[in-house]
Amino acid sequence: MTEQTIDNILPASKNNVKQWYVVHTASGAEKRIKEDILRKIAKQKMTDFFEDILIPVFGVSEVKRGKNVKVEKKLMPSYILIKMNMTDKSWHLVKNISGVTGFLGSKIVPKALTESEIQNIFNNLEAEAKVAKNSKLYEVGEVVTVTDGPFETFMGTVEEIDKERNRLKVSVSIFGKATPIELNFNQVKKND
């Protein structure tokens, strides 16, 4: 009976085909683990087996101690993405790094991401970055002008900001009465 190893199970490993894999890590240790993997790759002269290591992050601005500070938020906390040729040797290199808890997939054979799954992750990163950027454009209490829809040209005051849904609740005056309406970020503009 043949021993079950990655080299025996995955045909891609023999052809030097690099695919994306998801690695689960200890919480908050993603950067250190990425650096440790890169050091070990160089030390063991295995650069041909690895193409890229990503920590999916996007930048957001936050107010800390009264100052606007740019910080990185993780799209997938406790996970890193590695584009690699999966062999027994490369699998062991990553798996034996302190803080790595495993690959996504079965215990014996990690599951490579499909092109659509990878594209979805990159699209989510882009969308999160856009939401973070747009949500910082508006502040509660700020006066804006509606630029689209039935209330186009109405002026209103921002009451709530929903960053997840990319929406604002704006209070506009209709027949002299303040009426709250929900709008997308792209349906309003700041007043100069």
Curated annotation (Swiss-Prot):
Alphabetical GO biological process terms: DNA-templated transcription termination; regulation of DNA-templated transcription elongation; transcription antitermination; transcription elongation-coupled chromatin remodeling
Annotated SUPFAM superfamilies: N-utilization substance G protein NusG, N-terminal domain, Translation proteins SH3-like domain
Domain KOW as annotated: residue spans: 140-168
GO cellular component, one term: cytosol
Keywords annotated in UniProt: Transcription, Transcription antitermination, Transcription regulation, Transcription termination
Entry keyword Signal: no
Keyword Transcription: yes
Protein origin, superkingdom: Bacteria
Pfam families reported in the protein's UniProt record: KOW, NusG
HAMAP family (alphabetical): NusG (MF_00948)
Family that this chain belongs to: Belongs to the NusG family.
Function: Participates in transcription elongation, termination and antitermination.
Protein name as catalogued: Transcription termination/antitermination protein NusG
Organism from which the protein derives: Rickettsia typhi (strain ATCC VR-144 / Wilmington)
Gene: nusG
